[in-house]
């Protein structure tokens, strides 16, 4: 889902004459776009703060989750549980895989590319201020926000992680390994970490 401010014009600058910001808001494990939108009601600020709000959804997983199925905690493969393949700490694999270096164990699909392409698509259609591109994530989405900062710091101004964290094994964060990484070493990302 995409929420646009009144000033945003496709394929051009905004009607206010300045570029708009972009916030990608990522839901937590076993949530969806509607539930994160209700929990963190950012769309009410889209017009006054002049930013585009993108609310994508993670893939469905079919593992048991007491908070995600609609049948009182019993696995419901019809609805499943939406998650992000974020880090080795959380959550696409149905739980943390302590310090595993085998990405396939916790990354059954490539959400980094999915979110990267979403940001690129919005940037191609609207004039986005590159100093105002943020990923905000709650819980599993907060882990995914950290992952985006690790793998694509060049496209982000900052992240907000609410009850999320980074990799259990810090060496998996590509931005921290600038010697062996394709990530530019001068790409800095502001981080607001909220826990509680």
Regions found by a protein language model. Give the residues of each.
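Short hydrophobic segments within beta-strands
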Residues: 3, 25-26, 136, 194
């Amino acid at each position: 889902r995409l929420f646009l401010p009144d000033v945003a014009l496709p394929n051009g600058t905004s009607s206010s004459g300045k570029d708009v910001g972009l916030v990608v808001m990522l839901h937590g494990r076993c949530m969806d776009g509607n539930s994160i939108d209700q929990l963190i009601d950012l769309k009410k600020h889209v017009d006054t703060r002049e930013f585009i709000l993108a609310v994508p959804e993670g893939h469905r997983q079919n593992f048991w989750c007491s908070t995600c199925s609609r049948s009182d905690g019993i696995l419901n493969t019809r609805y499943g549980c939406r998650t992000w393949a974020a880090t080795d700490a959380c959550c696409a694999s149905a739980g943390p895989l302590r310090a595993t270096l085998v990405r396939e164990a916790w990354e059954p699909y490539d959400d980094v590319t999915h979110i990267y392409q979403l940001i690129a698509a919005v940037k191609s259609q609207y004039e986005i201020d590159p100093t105002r591109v943020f990923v905000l994530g709650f819980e599993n989405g907060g882990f995914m926000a950290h992952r985006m900062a690790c793998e694509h710091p060049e496209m982000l101004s900052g992240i907000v992680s609410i009850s999320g964290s980074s990799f259990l094994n810090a060496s998996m964060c590509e931005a921290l390994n600038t010697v062996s990484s394709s990530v530019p070493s001068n790409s800095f990302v502001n981080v607001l970490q909220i826990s509680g």
